[in-house]
């Protein structure tokens, strides 16, 4: 499907909606194409889901450490805009490597988790949003 219409197949979108938890949970998901915002908004609302939805890079849920995306929260299906997308890309993120290979990315991640490098502000903000939503369902 991607080669023909330029989008992933519908299965990719369905997987992003899955909640593997038996109890209350925050579904964290993202979209790339603007038309998916309306579809996901309607889905989360009609299903009464609790979710954090962001405008992702290639639809990936982990935010780009150089950008602050739009964040929409859904608490039991009720929508709230948390944050508008901030314009531009950070010129520099302390410690963020320019290489994007697996080994470099893994080493960078290890250093951030160990506290040797700072958590990028954009990622810290995403975690804050997740924790705030999770606190409302526990």
Model segments located where?
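Glycine-rich anion-binding loops and their surrounding alpha/beta cores
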Residues: 1-138
């Amino acid at each position: 499907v991607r080669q023909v219409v330029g989008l992933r197949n519908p299965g990719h979108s369905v997987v992003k909606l899955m909640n593997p938890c038996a109890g209350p949970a925050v579904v964290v998901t993202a979209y790339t194409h603007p038309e998916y915002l309306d579809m996901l908004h309607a889905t989360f609302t009609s299903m009464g889901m609790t979710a954090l939805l962001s405008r992702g890079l290639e639809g990936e849920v982990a935010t780009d450490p150089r950008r602050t995306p739009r964040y929409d929260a859904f608490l039991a299906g009720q929508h709230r805009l948390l944050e508008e997308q901030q314009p531009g890309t950070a010129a520099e993120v302390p410690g963020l490597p320019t290489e994007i290979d697996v080994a470099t990315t893994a080493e960078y991640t290890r250093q951030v988790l160990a506290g040797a490098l700072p958590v990028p502000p954009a990622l810290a903000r995403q975690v804050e949003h997740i924790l705030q939503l999770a606190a409302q369902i526990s």
